[in-house]
């Protein structure tokens, strides 16, 4: 079981109240909800845009003796959040390829249209996706994993 209520079992999706069908796991792909190439469609939480060049410069500033300014720090926090578990989900391969670096609104709509995985339900209810959302979802996924696989007792 990977849902607390038992509505979704590994390898199956509940289509109707009594009917289960096999889920084609080979058709799923791992998606970075906030994409690795985020600068084009994902402004910082203060609403300002970032260029790819500015993101690269922030990574270099990390090692400068004068340290980071607030903007560079925000850029680096975003860069560090992107590969985290809370930012990853499963989507149909074709959906992932068509959306790649799209804004959250487009990705959320695609989840509504093409996903019935319990894993994506919380994402479909959100209006925004940022570093705080990534951290919160990561903690929730870790808590769920510990309930499913509690380890040795």
Regions found by a protein language model. Give the residues of each.
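Short beta-strand-alpha-helix junction that forms the catalytic/metal-binding core
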Residues: 28, 41-96
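Long, cytosolic, alpha-helical-rich C-terminal regions that act as interaction/scaffolding modules
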Residues: 73-153
């Amino acid at each position: 079981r990977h849902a607390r209520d038992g509505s979704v079992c590994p390898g199956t999706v509940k289509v109707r109240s009594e009917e289960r069908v096999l889920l084609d796991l080979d058709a799923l792909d791992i998606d970075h909800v906030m994409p690795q190439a985020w600068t084009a469609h994902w402004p910082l939480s203060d609403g300002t845009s970032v260029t790819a060049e500015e993101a690269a410069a922030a990574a270099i500033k990390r090692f400068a003796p004068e340290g980071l300014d607030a903007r560079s720090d925000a850029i680096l926090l975003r860069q560090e959040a992107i590969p985290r578990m809370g930012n990853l989900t499963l989507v149909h391969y074709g959906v992932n390829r068509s959306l790649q670096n799209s804004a959250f609104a487009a990705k959320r709509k695609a989840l509504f249209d093409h996903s019935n995985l319990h894993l994506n339900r919380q994402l479909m209810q959100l209006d925004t996706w940022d570093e705080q959302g990534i951290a919160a979802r990561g903690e929730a996924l870790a808590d769920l994993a510990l309930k499913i696989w509690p380890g040795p007792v």
